[in-house]
A protein has these predicted regions:
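Polar/charged, compositionally biased leader and regulatory segments
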Residues: 2-6, 15-75
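Acidic, glycine-rich catalytic/binding loops that coordinate metals and/or anionic ligands
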Residues: 21-27, 31-34, 141-142, 148-150, ...
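Short glycine/threonine/proline-enriched tight-turn/helix- or strand-capping micro-motif at secondary-structure
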Residues: 46-53, 69-100
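Short coil/loop residues immediately preceding or within conserved phosphate-binding loops
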Residues: 63, 86-88, 96, 102, ...
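A residue-level detector for short acidic-glycine micro-motifs
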Residues: 70, 93, 109, 134-137, ...
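Zn2+-dependent peptidoglycan hydrolase active-site motif and core
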Residues: 84-86, 101-139
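Short hydrophobic beta/alpha edge segments that flank linear recognition/processing sites
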Residues: 91, 119-122, 147-161
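A structural signal for short beta-strand/turn segments enriched in small hydrophobics and glycine
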Residues: 99, 105-107, 143-155
């Protein structure tokens, strides 16, 4: 329930919604969502109040099966063995698995990034940016507009990496936030 509350709070109070008082909408959503399994009805209520979901990272960047190999937050770095903040999630996946844009946006970086190897960064509306790193191949160019679900690259192990995976980050108003809170939405609820 806490995760749903965080997502709903972000959606209702920081994104422009239309036609309904925000406090009333929040009450309706929280009454509908009894626990985390009730995300589909919650998304339905919010979707009725604006076309924001195209621009909010709300699907997994990988459609193939993956394993979360490292979480958002402090961790012991797997290579230099020091405690460091990990600003995204690492999703272990097969080599060259397709990587998808998690929201509509514009490519602002498509190239090498120190430590991250081949990386794509997308700027979305409402202060969101997403980063996709350690790619084996980039399938987009700077300045290109992409839609939610479009293929932007293929997973790999470039940069400082211990194996094939995707490092995925979400930034909201220049603050890195936990991507798992957004990845729980699936394509049927968007």
């Amino acid at each position: 329930m806490c995760r749903i509350f965080n997502i709903v709070f972000l959606m209702v109070f920081t994104l422009p919604m239309f036609g309904q008082d925000k406090a009333e909408l929040m009450a309706q959503v929280l009454q509908t969502a009894k626990d985390y399994r009730d995300i589909a009805p919650v998304m339905g209520i919010i979707k009725q109040n604006g076309q924001v979901f195209k621009y909010v990272p709300s699907i997994s960047p990988l459609m193939e099966r993956y394993r979360i190999s490292d979480y958002f937050g402090y961790r012991i770095h797997p290579i230099n063995k020091t405690k460091q903040f990990h600003s995204g999630v690492d999703l272990a996946v097969t080599y060259a698995a397709t990587v998808h844009a998690t929201a509509d946006g514009k490519i602002i970086l498509a190239g090498n990034m120190a430590g991250y190897g081949k990386t794509v960064v997308i700027r979305h509306k409402y202060g969101f940016k997403t980063q996709y790193s350690h790619l084996t191949y980039i399938y987009c160019t700077v300045g290109q507009e992409v839609g939610k679900g479009c293929v932007i690259g293929f997973a790999g192990s470039t940069g400082i990496s211990t194996g094939n995976h995707l490092h995925y980050e979400i930034v909201k108003n220049n603050k890195k936030i936990n991507p798992l809170n957004f990845m729980l939405w699936n394509s049927e609820t968007n």
